[in-house]
């Protein structure tokens, strides 16, 4: 009975960690090819937003200009204008199919994210006692660590997340969130978030760390400041 109680939280934690990848893989394997074929067969003209529509139109214009210049450089081939327009049409269809596939994958990612949130929320409500066991395990693990290891772990995590060398990681994370929700990446918005959000998070974490260390053990505050300096 004790082994079963110990195994259940581990299974629950593994389920939460691997659930998003499993759902995305299943959706992509079962529905990805079918949705792609249906979308391309129906020649859908749906765009997710105005920015993406503008981006596709600009790329199609660039493609037409590139093919036009390429035909000018190949004057000796004497390509017929009708063949030139046919080539543009084929390239445009191929380009739109590639764009449609990226949109479909984006929709699948967004759908799996929403499904994962719903399932995890349901498990949080349904298996609340399992979360209590996980919480007690984590607290026991933290209490068994020495003061120096606790402070070192806190400094390592804060430096990795909000240190001076972490802006590139924030850019990648915010960019991936943009892609998951179907937004076109805007460098100005991303740079603004990277320059402001970590600062706010750093202030909140420092305040929380000070209160936590001061409540657990005042000696931890001294060790924290000594290592941090």
Swiss-Prot record:
This is Potassium/proton antiporter CemA. It catalyses: K(+)(in) + H(+)(out) = K(+)(out) + H(+)(in). May be involved in proton extrusion. The gene is cemA. It holds the Pfam family CemA. It is a multi-pass membrane protein. HAMAP family: CemA_PxcA. GO terms for cellular component: plastid membrane. GO terms for biological process: proton transmembrane transport. The chain crosses the membrane at residues 7-27, 106-126, 189-209. It is found in: Plastid membrane. PANTHER family: CHLOROPLAST ENVELOPE MEMBRANE PROTEIN, CHLOROPLAST ENVELOPE MEMBRANE PROTEIN-RELATED. It comes from Cuscuta exaltata (Tall dodder). Belongs to the CemA family. Its main location: plastid. The keyword Repeat does not apply. Keywords: Hydrogen ion transport, Ion transport, Membrane, Plastid, Transmembrane, Transmembrane helix, Transport.
